[in-house]
UniProtKB/Swiss-Prot annotation:
Organism: Mus musculus
General function of this protein: Protein phosphatase that catalyzes the dephosphorylation of the C-terminal domain of RNA polymerase II. Plays a role in RNA processing and termination. Plays a role in pre-mRNA polyadenylation via its interaction with SYMPK.
Protein name, UniProt field: RNA polymerase II subunit A C-terminal domain phosphatase SSU72
EC number per UniProt: 3.1.3.16
Main location: nucleus
Cellular component annotations (GO), alphabetically ordered: cytosol; nucleoplasm
MF terms (GO), sorted A to Z: RNA polymerase II CTD heptapeptide repeat phosphatase activity
Entry's Gene Ontology BP terms: co-transcriptional mRNA 3'-end processing, cleavage and polyadenylation pathway
Length: 194
């Protein structure tokens, strides 16, 4: 088992649903975890598919909650958005953009391939300073409440297994292969350096 706790980041597009559900579950299990989005703005479903609610990453979850409560309490209660924002504001004040974070992680989990590509591109564009490896793993999770919950438990199980490896660098590929077979999902994996 590693001598220090695994430093984990979970990343989706808007730091609202998938990454926050995983953040919630991982932090309850005692992991050192942060969550992020990679988008230029935070997008939440609106009254129609072509009318999302768009916010800046500086907007707090509380401000978003109150804005949607004012706009249409019934709609945003019924579709679960207010419940999700209520959970989010109990975890941290506002969404965060991955590209603005300078913290180092051992493991970064992304929730869709486009986000994985953005994270890898960002890490590769940074100046390498410590040559410390960071494993970036993509677990495809559909962006709805049910899939976010299932995906978060899968991410948690994966983190627990990685936390208990003797040698993460040499065991992670085999571990991911086992998880692929067990879950029926394909994982993307690469190593970047800080």
């Amino acid at each position: 088992m590693p001598s220090s706790p695994l430093r984990v980041a979970v990343v989706c597009s808007s730091n609202q649903n998938r990454s926050m559900e995983a953040h919630n579950i991982l932090s309850k299990r005692g992991f050192s975890v942060r969550s992020f989005g990679t988008g230029t703005h935070v997008k939440l479903p609106g009254p129609a598919p072509d009318k999302p609610n768009v916010y800046d990453f500086k907007t707090t979850y509380d401000q978003m909650y109150n804005d949607l409560l004012r706009k249409d309490k019934e709609l945003y209660t019924q579709n679960g958005i207010l419940h999700m924002l209520d959970r989010n504001k109990r975890i941290k004040p506002r969404p965060e953009r991955f590209q603005n974070c300078t913290d180092l992680f051992d493991l970064i989990l992304t929730c869709e391939e486009r986000v994985y590509d953005q994270v890898v591109e960002d890490l590769n564009s940074r100046e390498q300073e410590t040559c410390q490896p960071v494993h970036v793993v993509n677990v495809d999770i559909q962006d709805n409440h049910e899939e976010a919950t299932l995906g978060a438990f899968l991410i948690c199980e994966l983190c627990q297994c990685i936390q208990h490896t003797e040698d993460m660098e040499n065991e992670i590929d085999e571990l991911l292969q086992e998880f692929e077979e067990k879950s029926g999902r394909a994982f993307l994996h690469t190593v970047c350096f800080y």
